[in-house]
Structure formats: structure tokens, C-alpha cells
Amino acid sequence: MAHKKGTGSTRNGRDSNSKRLGVKAYGGEKVSAGSIIIRQRGTSFLPGINVGKGKDDTLFALKEGTVSFDSIKRNLRNRKRVNVVL
């Protein structure tokens, strides 16, 4: 028989690293071509004028300019859109 009480195991004890998602350049900020505007999972924000979308749904500036946000009605709901105005 054991003289010590055996310790149980736990299924906790691990956590993933943060992915640093969110808006990186806010409305009114100047951005250069290729700079990241928003990192996101899925399309919370849609790309607008002079904005491209990467394979991980990251929005980035295609041209140098100023970031602006607006809202468009699409498929019975309002969607947020990001533009880069020259």
C-alpha cells in the first residue's frame, strides 16, 4: 500500500499566445503603401478604396494616404468599410 497520497493530473495548464489582432491605424492617420490597417479573423471590416485584403483577412493600404472608416448597407445589415483617401 502507498504511504503517500498520489497526486492527480489536471487537464488545464496551457494557454495560447495572443495574436495581436485589432485596428493598427485609426481614422485620420496617414499610412504608407503596404502598411497594415487592421488585423482580424474573418471580415469584421471590409476593404474599400485603396485597401487590399490578405489571405488571413488582414487589411492593408495599397497606396499612401489617410485612413477613413465608413458604413455600407450590405445583405440587410450594415458593414464597416475601410478606405485610404489620397
Curated annotation (Swiss-Prot):
PANTHER family: LARGE RIBOSOMAL SUBUNIT PROTEIN BL27M (PTHR15893:SF0), RIBOSOMAL PROTEIN L27 (PTHR15893). Belongs to the bacterial ribosomal protein bL27 family. Residues 1-24 are annotated as: Disordered. The keyword Ribonucleoprotein applies. GO terms for cellular component: cytosolic large ribosomal subunit. GO terms for biological process: translation. This is Large ribosomal subunit protein bL27. Disulfide bonds: none annotated.
